[in-house]
Amino acid sequence: MAQKKIRIRLKAYEHRILDQSAEKIVETAKRTGAEIAGPIPLPTERTLYTILRSPHKHKDSREQFEMRTHKRLIDIVNPTDKTVDALRKLELPSGVAIEIKL
């Protein structure tokens, strides 16, 4: 018997918003009777940008900026029709990117 599975990947720059969104998704799926695996924390992507402080000279004086992308993975096993409808109607904060695979 083949199992249906929905895989949801969440990405955000702020981990608090990301965790709140993951909790909303888990709570909604549990309320509609689906099995949940997660939220699983994935490795944080760290991007470092190095720029010169001065516009013309002083090459040794530099400044570094960092951007961290936090990620979570949620698997919903054997979702019901109610689960899919509830997830479509769910509103999440604007700072969270969602990728859904069926």
Curated annotation (Swiss-Prot):
Among the Pfam families in the record, one is: Ribosomal_S10
Which cysteines are disulphide-bonded? none
Its biological purpose: Involved in the binding of tRNA to the ribosomes.
HAMAP family reported for this sequence: Ribosomal_uS10
* Biological processes annotated in GO: translation
Similarity-based family? Belongs to the universal ribosomal protein uS10 family.
Record organism: Leuconostoc citreum (strain KM20)
Q: Which InterPro entries match?
A: Ribosomal_uS10, Ribosomal_uS10_CS, Ribosomal_uS10_dom, Ribosomal_uS10_dom_sf
**Keywords per UniProt:** Ribonucleoprotein, Ribosomal protein
The superkingdom listed in its UniProt entry is Bacteria
* A GO CC term assigned to this protein in UniProt: ribosome
Provide the protein name. Answer: Small ribosomal subunit protein uS10
Any one GO molecular function term: structural constituent of ribosome
How does this polypeptide assemble, per the annotation? Part of the 30S ribosomal subunit.
